[in-house]
Amino acid sequence: MKNIEKLEQSLTYEFKDKNLLIHALTHKSFKKSYNNERLEFLGDAVLDLVVGEYLFHKFAKDAEGDLSKLRAALVNEKSFAKIANSLNLGDFILMSVAEENNGGKEKPSILSDALEAIIGAIHLEAGFEFAKTIALRLIEKNFPQIDAKILIKDYKTKLQEITQGKIGQTPQYETVRAFGPDHLKQFEIALMLDGKELARAIAGSKKEAQQMAAKIALEKLGAL
């Protein structure tokens, strides 16, 4: 593990109890009886509330459904992993040699969980307001333009609304292949419409590849 003081500097928060920070950085593969899963559980709840309250005030005229989509676009593994990478969090996480050799320090799930655990740890030590301040600073730094149109990239829904309205057809998404090692698995998805391939995309998850394919299709249709 690197010097955790560097991580504290990036967080702009110095832990009084260094063991609490180390606890938040301990993956279950390193020590089953002493890992960050409980702190992750707490941090997840804190972040859910922090982001929910933030969006409630920032998008004062938006309906509940739109706010829920916005929160889902921010409170997820991919977004939290991005923030974790900005902190070089993988360098500080304690994990087994086997997990590290399997790409553990780059896994979005592990990075995201560690970030949540750190926020949970700050909440335990300093209270909600401290955790809120730090969480919002990290979110705004990594997502400087928090805009509904940018965050809610639900291209699949938009495409389906267009195709159903114009030709009464629903796009179908077929998995062409899955390839790569387990920790870097890639999926190739073909978007089919009325029996013809309209677009194709590759991404690290089926859902992401489907969204990318839908975006390509929308661009072809001139709907973006």
UniProtKB/Swiss-Prot annotation:
Cofactor(s) essential for the protein: Mg(2+)
TM stretches of this protein: none
Start and end residues of each RNase III domain: 4-127
CDD domains in the cross-refs: DSRM_RNAse_III_family, RIBOc
Alphabetical list of PROSITE patterns matching this protein: DS_RBD, RNASE_3_1, RNASE_3_2
Pfam families: dsrm, Ribonucleas_3_3
Residues in DRBM domain copies: 154-223
Biological process per Gene Ontology, one example term: tRNA processing
Entry-linked PANTHER family: RIBONUCLEASE 3 (PTHR11207:SF0), RIBONUCLEASE III (PTHR11207)
The protein's name: Ribonuclease 3
The organism of origin for this protein: Campylobacter jejuni subsp. jejuni serotype O:2 (strain ATCC 700819 / NCTC 11168)
Organism lineage string: Bacteria, Pseudomonadati, Campylobacterota, Epsilonproteobacteria, Campylobacterales
